[in-house]
């Protein structure tokens, strides 16, 4: 595995929509890069204010505060050396069912409604400070269609161009691979975010989710650091409790579902390619 060596352009910036996305989709990659000597920086568009609530979060503890604390613990597990929040509000769900029932209105400051120019300028400032060698964002679908994830894709591309970041990796999932394993959390999220486009009898291979196998440029085997990834996911206990489908998986099934992470690449080979 190649080491970045000393000096500038040794940072890889991971840009995510909400706390817990980093652990689910890129946690193993982050841990592997950190172990190889890369500076791992984590940036969130929102604090996940519209996430799941639970009895473990008291009425005097705003969910955003709880989730930021969980993020700090997960980031420490994964070796991230800097964590930043851009300060936008979680947009919540924006699916047909919500719009039909009148529940589709977004809160003020929602990331999905933010100016791409403004948001990308904020992110580009961090990329420039870090002299980032690569940026990790999401594919054009936002992996599974959540409006904040789609906005991460747009903002990430614009920010990388502004900061002249050489390589952009777009986190995704290989939907054909997931067709053959136990349910991934992203499949459950797809059903919630887009119930009108839920998985049909054709299975995940035809679902509005991720990319096909041939569209994936980098498949990272993160099984060597899977215990680290699992701890990082568990740190987000407000959203991924012990009773969740992911945390209840036996080790072998967890490895099959979460042991690989997938990326499409824009630009030249970069840090994540050294892991494959």
Range-by-range predicted roles:
Residues 1-13, 98, 106-276:
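Metal-dependent de-N-acetylase/amidase catalytic core
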